[in-house]
Each structure stands twice: as C-alpha cells, then as structure tokens.
Regions:
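Residues embedded in well-ordered secondary-structure elements
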Residues: 13-16, 39
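Bacterial N-terminal signal peptides that target proteins for export
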Residues: 2-14
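An acidic-aromatic pocket/loop used at catalytic or ligand-binding sites
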Residues: 2, 26-60, 66-145
C-alpha cells in the first residue's frame, strides 16, 4: 500500500507564495551618504552626516550636505540631471528647489531631494558666490505616512 502526502498538491502553491513574499521584501534603508550610495557626485558637495528624525511622522533618515555658494550651480545642475530636482528659485530671503522625489530603479527606495541656501539678500544667480553655503538634504522615510 502506497501512502500519498496530503501536502504534495499544495507544495507548488506554498513555494509560489514564499517566492512572492520574498520578492516583495526589501532591505530596510540605513542612515548613510545617500548621494554616495546612488553614485558619484561633484567634489564641491560635502557630506555632513546622517540622522533619523524619530519625532517626524514618517521617521525619515536624513543625510545632509553643504556646498559653497561659488560651487552651487554645479551642484544644482548635478541634482537636476541625475535626480530631476527642480531649478532653485528665490523666495523671500533664500534660494530653494522645493522638495523633489526620486525613486532608485535598482533598490526601489524613494528619496526626497532638497537644495536650499542659507538666509540671504543675494537674489540673483550671479550673486551666488556671495552666499557662504547652500544645503542639500536627501531623506528616506522609514514609516508609511
């Protein structure tokens, strides 16, 4: 008398379910130099560090950078060409790109990219060298909103 397993007909279904679950998993992002992780960036951009805003609604990981005003146009062009960030505009008392979202096609991680100047009266692009620093933040949400 031959015994047949009851689970044998279910085996393909179980394997398919496990494959689908594993395929949808992605490694949790960690705090790091996000621009460096995504590729090379201009030397004028200086990585300052990364921290997590645990008080924020989505507990984002935030990598910060700074770039001298004299080199800001190169940094802006790189962020526009590489990540689709908008052109910096002067509002009131600072230059701001407004937040832009970039999805890395390799990891599937969504990044928020923002570039802004310190407070300034220099309202013409030709005056950017007078601005000591522009700041770049690249953030990744760790929780759903």
């Amino acid at each position: 008398m031959r015994r047949t397993s009851r689970t044998k007909p279910l085996r393909p279904l179980i394997i398919l379910t496990l494959l689908l679950l594993c395929g949808s998993l992605q490694a949790a992002p960690k705090c790091e130099d996000f621009l460096g992780t995504l590729g090379a960036y201009p030397k004028g951009i200086q990585y300052q560090g990364c921290h997590q805003d645990i008080e924020g609604q989505t507990a984002p990981l935030i990598a910060t950078y700074k770039v001298r005003g004299a080199e800001a146009a190169v940094a802006e062009a790189h962020l526009q060409q590489t990540y689709g960030m908008g052109r910096l505009q002067f509002f009131c008392c600072m230059w701001d790109s407004l937040r832009h979202f970039h999805r890395d096609p390799h990891s599937g991680i969504n990044y928020q990219v923002l570039m802004a100047s310190e407070e300034t009266l220099a309202n013409q692009r030709s005056q950017w060298a007078q601005i000591e620093f522009f700041y770049i933040t690249v953030s990744v949400d760790t929780l759903e909103p």
